[in-house]
């Protein structure tokens, strides 16, 4: 089978560098444009099934790309829940929160954001969702629209990097990745391939 991975388009919260996971922000004008560019790119690509996170920013992106084709939403592939850090910028955090965040970024497998989702619970949730997608779509071409953290977990799972590789897979908005998956072999056609080539890329 072949898996295509897309991160949702830009939101105003992305533009402001805010922390958010389950906060249900929609994509902004730039995000809509990114999704439209991806829609045009995927018109040339055969897709049998489309899955999306149930959060608005991913689903809206998927709906634009799908261009009328059906989409199956999956809560399992939504982003990490940030707890009390949801909908905040670095500047809006207390000094104590900033210290904890720095610690979390170096020991994310063992530390949990205040009132948030434990990383390994998140990782297992997402990868179990990906396993279901693979199990139910053998031999098919599948598009998955999700979030940066969730997509990173998926790439970690596919490559065998595991949770320790979490920071090694940063999915850009307006780009896609494509992976051939079989029982014996994993082959990346591309990672962060632009929907539209722009000057300087």
Range-by-range predicted roles:
Residues 38-100:
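Phosphate-coordination/substrate-recognition cap region in phosphate-metabolizing enzymes
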Residues 41, 64, 68, 132, ...:
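Active-site catalytic microenvironments for nucleophilic, acid-base chemistry
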Residues 15-18, 81, 99-113:
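Short, basic/glycine-rich phosphate-binding loops at helix/coil junctions
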Residues 74, 82-92, 135-141, 156-201:
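Acidic, low-complexity terminal tails and accessory targeting/binding regions
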Residues 11, 150-151:
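Short active-site segment of divalent metal-dependent hydrolases/proteases
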Residues 2, 70-72, 187:
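Conserved beta-strand segments of alpha/beta enzyme cores
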Residues 3, 7-61, 113-126:
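Loop-to-helix element that buttresses phosphate recognition and phosphoryl-transfer chemistry
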